[in-house]
Amino acid sequence: MNVCVIGLGSMGKRRIRLLKQFFHELKIIGIDNNLERMKSVSTEYKVDCYLALSEFGEKADCAFVCTSPQFHASIIKECLERNLHVFSEINLIDKLYDENIRLAEQKGKTLFLSSTPLYKDEIQLIRSKVKQNGRPCAYQYHVGQYLPDWHPWDKLDKFFISNKSTNGCRELLAIELPWIQSVFGRIKAVKTTKTNLTDLKIDFYDTFLIQIEHETGAVGNLAVDVVSRQAVRRLEIFNEELYIRWNGTPNSLYEKDIISKQLKQIPAGTYIHESGYSEAINEYAYLKEIENFFEAIEGKEALYSFEEDKEILKIID
């Protein structure tokens, strides 16, 4: 199978790294219109790279779209028109969603959307325990990191997280809300307080405090920011018979034993960490969603869809 990775920034490199490490039968091609980046990735990962998909003479079978989100829509459309199965990183805007969904159906191709937390063992365990408990619960969740620390090697004004339509808080919400809805039930209502706490030259709010009501009766407080100088993911879930705590990593998931009154660690699967990233970034979850993409090509249902994401983006808007 010929696999094109389009966009050779941090996410494109991650996908290439995992594809080379765990899927040895694939031929991997890199695509990036930045000549310097294209050459660098070709040298570092020993893959053929091109400036445009049209330069790749052989027929590709699928594409990973890993560019900045504002460019996804047109690239996805081109890939589908070329009869490629498509894996897309999160989009943040729903441009061409309906058109690309219809095009994928017409072409008989898989249109797959990343939602990495859904593939984390911790999230799947949390979901299982909340469902098993069977009662409405409350939760508090804080996720944030100071915006310039996301990619310190990039100039902030050149990075899509500083763009109003694809900003850092919007990305965090697009990452977190799908699993929150999966665990606690369909979102019924939200109330939001938003403000700016930094002196960063940005044209969007840097802090959101959100109260969420779910159709199941669950309620939550969600704090999302690009202010916190400590990268943080901190979750507490509770009701009369349940208490769960998680700090974003596989070894930080705890549940209170109601009988013994002791907090007990819950083993939460495999942890693969890449140097230079927050400890909350588990490469294993990225690997699992790549596997799900290839399974979806063979007919298995994906964990997340463009249709579901369209609804999440409406909530964010």
What are these regions (language model features)?
Residues 1-44:
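N-terminal Rossmann-like dinucleotide-binding module
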Residues 28, 61, 137:
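Conserved acidic residues
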Residues 62, 69, 73-118:
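Beta-strand-loop-alpha-helix segment that lines the small-molecule cofactor/substrate pocket
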Residues 62-65, 109, 215, 280, ...:
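C-terminal helix-rich "cap/oligomerization" subdomain common to oxidoreductases
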Residues 66-67, 143:
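Glycine-rich, N-terminal phosphate-binding loop of Rossmann-like dinucleotide-binding domains
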Residues 172-252, 287-300:
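Contiguous beta-strand/loop segments that form the cofactor/metal-binding neighborhood of enzyme cores
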